[in-house]
Design a protein with these regions (language model features):
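Conserved glycine-rich cofactor-binding loop
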Residues: 10-11
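The beta1-alpha1 cofactor-binding region of Rossmann-like NAD(H)/NADP(H)-dependent oxidoreductases
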Residues: 51-62, 95
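Conserved glycine-rich Rossmann-like NAD(P)H-binding loop of the short-chain dehydrogenase/reductase
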Residues: 24-40
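Hydrophobic positions on the long internal alpha-helix
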Residues: 78, 112-116, 120, 163-164
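A glycine-rich helix->loop->beta "capping" turn
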Residues: 66-79, 85
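Catalytic loop of short-chain dehydrogenase/reductase
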Residues: 83, 91-102, 121-172, 183
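C-terminal helical subdomain
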Residues: 158, 173-174, 178, 194-243
Length: 243
């Protein structure tokens, strides 16, 4: 039996990842800030709901205690919880913007991983997937054709990628990887300002927009990484992504 936790799993990619991993035979804890919403989604996908707010230390500790008491270990952690705020460019973005985005995307992911480390270490086949983004790639951001001008969100994903690298190095028995689902048609990537382009406008402009199923694919595959599989990598649906 494989015991898995997917954070931020009440909708979008997180929900689809949880659903797919249940179908793959894993016992999935579906992490949700709102337990009522999580209970409904878990029932729909065949998972077990668990209250988990990545920005709340008490919530994380309670989730760790529950999983420890119920199964004693954690085989797979999918660090999916995140926010898409912080779209403003340098010169407009504030330190407050950075703090808001980092609180969930970096400090939240780090807090969850730190707290669950003993349970992950207790697994014979430990796997960690940090859900990142191509906008966190330094190589892609410095490419001549880069169009990204955001500050907070790309910074947060670059930091998350560094966490992947360092955990992969510190725990060589674990399989720790970053996944980028690509731009995916969910409410996470929908308009965030009055003049923000819609998903349909982006698609019309020639940008590739993944379905939720397509966006979840690389995360699911990394969650199923075998003990001799890759670690310390950054991967999208089309293969490796440069750091």
């Amino acid at each position: 039996m494989t015991y898995t936790l997917v954070t931020g799993a009440t909708r979008g990619i997180g929900r689809e990842v949880a659903r797919r991993l249940v179908l793959a035979g894993q016992t999935v804890y579906l992490g949700a800030r709102d337990l009522a919403a999580g209970t409904d989604v878990a029932a729909a996908v065949g998972a077990t709901p668990i209250q988990l707010d990545a920005t709340d230390a008490d919530s994380i500790a309670a989730a760790v205690d529950r999983i420890r008491d119920e199964v004693g270990l954690l085989d797979v952690l999918v660090n999916n919880a995140g926010i898409a705020g912080g779209q403003r460019p340098p010169g407009e973005a504030t330190v407050a913007d950075l703090r808001t985005v980092f609180e969930t995307n970096v400090f939240g992911a780090a807090a969850v991983l730190e707290a669950f480390t003993p349970l992950i270490e207790a697994s014979s086949t430990p796997v960690v997937v940090n859900v990142s983004s191509a906008v966190g790639s330094l190589a892609l951001n410095t490419a001549p054709n880069s169009r990204w001008t955001m500050l907070a969100y790309p910074m947060s994903k670059a930091a998350l990628n560094m966490m992947t690298i360092q955990y992969a190095r510190a725990f060589p028995r674990w399989r720790v990887n970053s996944a980028t689902p690509g731009l995916t048609a969910t409410d996470f990537t929908g308009p965030r300002a009055a003049d923000a382009p819609s998903i349909e406008q982006l698609r019309t402009a020639g940008m590739q927009i993944n379905t939720v199923e397509q966006g979840a694919e690389v995360i699911v595959q990394l969650a199923l990484t075998p003990p001799d599989g890759p670690t310390g990598t950054f991967v999208g649906n089309d293969g490796p992504v440069p750091w």
